[in-house]
């Protein structure tokens, strides 16, 4: 571990790393992963009441080294270095810690043959992942991030195994507020990483969710993992915590609004909780004279009215307020006109509003 840490410190600020040192680091991580997997299989990382004092001392020391192993990998995840060799080692570290999560889930269950997922260790992984990356790589157009680590996590784990996704939002819900409190400077990274994970595809196929949730990283997971209602609750709470934790910029509002109706709202238990966020988005668009922001906010409100029976009597009043000549110069003009046609042919439209528009 000391040798690995020395190499990690050497990376920081370096413009290059020769292949020999990179291979040395990867070999060290691979060796440590095998050692800790073996220790897990032999229950050497558990403190048991039947252990002698000497055994407890040894187990305590091993646990400290186990924790240090994760710290070493997570440290390099935070490096804001766009060099390929850094990304390569970050991704190698991801594979290693996820193998450990799998091993711990297998060997550290409270009882023999008892379904178990290593939530405490995975919580550390989630916390480290969501603050990873370089702020300079956040795209202004959609607030996604070019973060090789997050993209690899999405491809190999998040989108491939349901238990990984289920526990990601379970742990995020539980730890997000504390992460943002401890690392307030990382808010932009958290938002960009979450948008990147969520926007690529749906959380699960709504027409065939059962078969999707059967694919898991851990062989024997608790039965609750297949409960979509609990997943939606965790997903919903994670987003609400994030949206309420800090005042957002106009670009951040837009990025969230553009994915809201397809990637977020369908996977919440009670999407009407987004009403305040959508209203704030609309109002900010008016204040900043950015009608495009108000338009996409109205689109989100419309989804809640149409699909979840949200009672929002001010909708058409707010729509009427943005019907100005400026609309003709917007990049999303054609999209808005399609939305307007939908709004104006809806059964939600009252006779009074129809008369006002005709007038």
Language-model-detected regions and their locations in the chain:
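C-terminal structural cap/anchor segments
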Residues: 342-359
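Alpha-helical solenoid scaffolds in large eukaryotic transport, assembly, and signaling factors
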Residues: 1-319, 323-324, 341-346
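Active-site-adjacent beta->alpha loops and helix N-cap segments on the catalytic face
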Residues: 329
């Amino acid at each position: 571990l000391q040798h690995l840490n020395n190499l990690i410190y050497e990376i920081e600020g370096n413009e290059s790393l020769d292949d020999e040192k990179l291979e040395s680091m990867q070999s060290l991580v691979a060796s440590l992963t095998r050692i800790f997997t073996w220790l897990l299989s032999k229950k050497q990382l558990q403190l048991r009441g039947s252990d002698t004092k000497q055994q407890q001392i040894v187990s305590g020391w091993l646990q400290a080294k186990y924790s240090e192993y994760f710290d070493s990998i997570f440290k390099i995840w935070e490096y804001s270095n766009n060099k390929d060799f850094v990304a390569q080692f970050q991704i190698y570290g991801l594979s290693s810690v996820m193998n450990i999560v799998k091993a711990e889930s297998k060997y550290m269950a409270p009882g023999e043959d008892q379904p178990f997922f290593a939530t405490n260790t995975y919580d550390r992984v989630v916390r480290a992942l969501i603050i990873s990356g370089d702020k300079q790589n956040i795209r202004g157009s959609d607030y996604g991030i070019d973060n090789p680590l997050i993209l690899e996590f999405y491809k190999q784990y998040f989108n491939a195994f349901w238990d990984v996704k289920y526990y990601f939002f379970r742990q995020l819900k539980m730890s997000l507020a504390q992460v943002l409190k401890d690392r307030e400077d990382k808010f932009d990274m958290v938002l960009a990483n979450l948008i990147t994970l969520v926007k690529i595809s749906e959380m699960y196929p709504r027409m065939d969710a059962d078969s999707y949730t059967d694919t898991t990283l851990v062989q024997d997971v608790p039965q609750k993992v297949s409960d979509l209602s609990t997943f939606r609750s965790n997903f919903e709470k994670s987003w609400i915590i994030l949206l309420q934790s800090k005042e957002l910029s106009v670009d951040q509002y837009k990025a969230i609004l553009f994915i809201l109706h397809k990637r977020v709202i369908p996977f919440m238990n009670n999407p009407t909780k987004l009403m305040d966020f959508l209203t704030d988005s609309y109002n900010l668009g008016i204040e900043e004279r950015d009608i495009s922001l108000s338009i996409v906010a109205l689109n989100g409100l419309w989804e809640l009215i149409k699909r979840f029976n949200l009672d929002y009597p001010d909708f058409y009043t707010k729509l009427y307020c943005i019907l100005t000549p400026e609309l003709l110069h917007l990049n999303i003009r054609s999209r808005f006109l399609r939305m307007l046609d939908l709004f104006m042919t809806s059964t939600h439209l009252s006779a009074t509003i129809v008369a006002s528009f005709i007038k």
